[in-house]
C-alpha cells in the first residue's frame, strides 16, 4: 500500500470480519475453490500472492489440505495464466516432501504445479509465521506457542519428534514476521 499498490483480496464470507479496514484494498467475497471468484480476484493485477495454509482439516466443511493447499493453488495459478499475470508468489512450508504428512504433500504438490508453468515464480517456505496480525494484543498461534513453550525454563524446540535432546539443532527454522 505504501508503494501505491491496490491489492485485491479473496475473502470467505464467514471471515470478512477478520479483515481489518485497510484503505485501498478491494475485497472479493468468495472461495478459492470457486474458479469464478478466483478469476475475478486476479483480473487486472500484476502479481498473485498465494498464502493459504491450514494446520488442520475440517472434512465435513471441505476444508482439507487437498482442497486449499493444492486445489486452490491450482485454481489461482491457472487463473493467473489465463489472465496474463506472469508473476506468482507461493507461500509453501518448511519440510515439504512428496511422501510426508498430508500438509507436507499438498504443499509440495502445489510447488511442483507452479514450477511446471511459464510464470515468473517465487516459492518461500517459512517454518512459522509470528506476530500480532490484528494489533489487538492477541498473538496468532506461533507467537502463543513461543510464549508457552520456548520461553519456559526448558525450551521445547523439537515439536515433530518430541523432546529428544540429541536431535537439538537438526531441524530448519525459517520464521517470518507478519510485517515481512
Q: What is each model feature region?
A:
Residues 3-5, 99-180:
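Oxidoreductase cofactor-interface core, primarily capturing Rossmann-like NAD(P)-dependent enzymes
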Residues 5-13:
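Conserved glycine-rich Rossmann-like NAD(P)H-binding loop of the short-chain dehydrogenase/reductase
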Residues 34, 72-75, 87, 110, ...:
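Conserved cofactor-binding/catalytic machinery of classical short-chain dehydrogenase/reductase
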Residues 82-87, 118-119:
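A short helix->loop->beta-strand "cap" motif at the edges of active sites that frequently abuts
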Amino acid at each position: 500500500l505504501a508503494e501505491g499498490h491496490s491489492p485485491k483480496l479473496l475473502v470467505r464470507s464467514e471471515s470478512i470480519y477478520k479483515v481489518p479496514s485497510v484503505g485501498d484494498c478491494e475485497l472479493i467475497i468468495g472461495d478459492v475453490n470457486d474458479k469464478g471468484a478466483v478469476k475475478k480476484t486476479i483480473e487486472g493485477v500484476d502479481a498473485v500472492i498465494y498464502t493459504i495454509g491450514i494446520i488442520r482439516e475440517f472434512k465435513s466443511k471441505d476444508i482439507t489440505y487437498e482442497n486449499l493447499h493444492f486445489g486452490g493453488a491450482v485454481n489461482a495459478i491457472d487463473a493467473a495464466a489465463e489472465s496474463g499475470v506472469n508473476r506468482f508468489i507461493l507461500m509453501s512450508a518448511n519440510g515439504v516432501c512428496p511422501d510426508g504428512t498430508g500438509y507436507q504433500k499438498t504443499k509440495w504438490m502445489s510447488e511442483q504445479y507452479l514450477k511446471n508453468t511459464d510464470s515468473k515464480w517465487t516459492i518461500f517456505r517459512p517454518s512459522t509465521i509470528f506476530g500480532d496480525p490484528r494489533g489487538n494484543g492477541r498473538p496468532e498461534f506461533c507467537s502463543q506457542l513461543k510464549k508457552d513453550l520456548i520461553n519456559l525454563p526448558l525450551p521445547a524446540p523439537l515439536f515433530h519428534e518430541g523432546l529428544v535432546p540429541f536431535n537439538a539443532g537438526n531441524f530448519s527454522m525459517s520464521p517470518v514476521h507478519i510485517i515481512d
